[in-house]
Amino acid sequence: MTTYAVGDLQGCLEPLTCLLERVDFSPSRDCLWLAGDLVNRGPQSLEALRFVRDLESSAITVLGNHDLHLLAVAHNIERMRKSDTLQAILDAPDRADLIDWLRQQKLIHYDAERHTAMVHAGIPPQWSLEKALRRAAEVEQALQDDALLLPFLDGMYGNQPAKWNKELHGVPRLRLITNYFTRMRFCKADGTLDLDAKEGADSAPAGYAPWFSHASRKTRNVKLIFGHWAALEGQCDEPNVFALDTGCVWGNAMTLMNLDSGEMHRCECEHGKPA
């Protein structure tokens, strides 16, 4: 058995199938980790979502911001944006099954044997892995509880609060947890977020740094897999931290990592398909 991890699909299924064929991936034998943002902007959001769902226990995915956006759109909380490519999912005969499957997924996955965690955007530097898993569980409960789902989705959007306070409660608390795990790039050592800056690691606003580069980061002893930040181009210059979103949907590449050997496989892409 081999375990692989891949960055954001964003509705680009063909590059993934190309990579899986290259490594002779077998669902009966191997496992695929996906770092979130399965859907949106690419040409095959519906097909990508079905593909991952149908892998069943051979796939482990965490939720990204685009996946959460799909949940909000599907529940009539948020409108579609011009760049969204979600309509095929909303019109699909298995829409209800797909949406229900998506809301059961986690924000963080941790493999104790590998001492490896996967998250879409990152883990704020002031939180230990144990604390991050507890915070993620709060949002996961809101997503999976019918009574909590709509209030959470309705209050999910927004950049405030930007700094963690243990006294936060209700939707603002869940919004900040969600922003940490699905939208974060730059923050201060105390976890104060800047969600406006979206370029490479060297474009940090004054007083901020990439979340993974803070010397005080409490997850330095954990191997971390993340996606989301395509502008890093797979480079983060931190031991044990692996940026796997290499911008397939933007015409760059999709990257598949062998978690056992560390080997990286790339599929160059154009218009969401193998170049």
UniProtKB/Swiss-Prot annotation:
Matching Pfam families: Metallophos
SUPFAM superfamilies for the chain: Metallo-dependent phosphatases (SSF56300)
Catalytic activity line of the entry: P(1),P(4)-bis(5'-adenosyl) tetraphosphate + H2O = 2 ADP + 2 H(+)
InterPro entries xref list: ApaH, Calcineurin-like_PHP_ApaH, Metallo-depent_PP-like
Keywords: Hydrolase
GO MF annotations, alphabetized: bis(5'-nucleosyl)-tetraphosphatase (symmetrical) activity
E.C. number: 3.6.1.41
Disulfides per UniProt: none
Keyword check for Secreted: no
Record bears the keyword Protein biosynthesis: no
UniProt record similarity statement: Belongs to the Ap4A hydrolase family.
Task performed by this protein: Hydrolyzes diadenosine 5',5'''-P1,P4-tetraphosphate to yield ADP.
Protein name per the record: Bis(5'-nucleosyl)-tetraphosphatase, symmetrical
